[in-house]
């Protein structure tokens, strides 16, 4: 059974120009650029948490997938096991996190990398703005 709900193909091989989390507004905005120079903006709303690693100056995305909540807990079991007791992402236990994600309709967006930045965003909605 596939964990992928949908793929966002507009981001393949895009360079990341910038990203900004607005914790007060519960949002995260990422601006990317295609190889041909077109801008693609990604706007997450209803942000619960995000986790990025391997962030460098010249990040190139492989793509982004929305995955199932079960898939998220399988894929990030080790990370969550070590971090949830420190309040990341926003709960005291794995069970509480799952309940909150269900209650608040939080979706899981996994960002894969060709170079640099990768990780996930937990948010209610995502919108891509393409030219």
Segments (PLM) and residue ranges:
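Surface-exposed, interaction-prone regions used to assemble/regulate multi-protein complexes
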Residues: 1-131
């Amino acid at each position: 059974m596939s964990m992928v709900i949908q793929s966002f193909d507009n981001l393949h091989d895009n360079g990341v120009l910038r990203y900004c989390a607005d914790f007060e507004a519960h949002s995260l905005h990422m601006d990317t650029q295609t190889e041909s120079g077109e801008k693609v903006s990604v706007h997450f709303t209803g942000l619960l948490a995000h986790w990025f690693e391997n962030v460098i100056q010249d990040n190139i995305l492989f793509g982004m997938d929305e995955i199932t909540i079960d898939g998220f807990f399988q894929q990030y079991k080790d990370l969550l096991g070590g971090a949830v007791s420190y309040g990341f992402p926003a709960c005291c236990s794995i069970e509480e996190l799952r309940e909150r994600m269900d209650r608040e309709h939080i979706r899981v967006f996994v960002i894969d990398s060709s170079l640099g930045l990768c990780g996930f965003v937990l948010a209610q909605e995502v919108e891509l703005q393409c030219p």
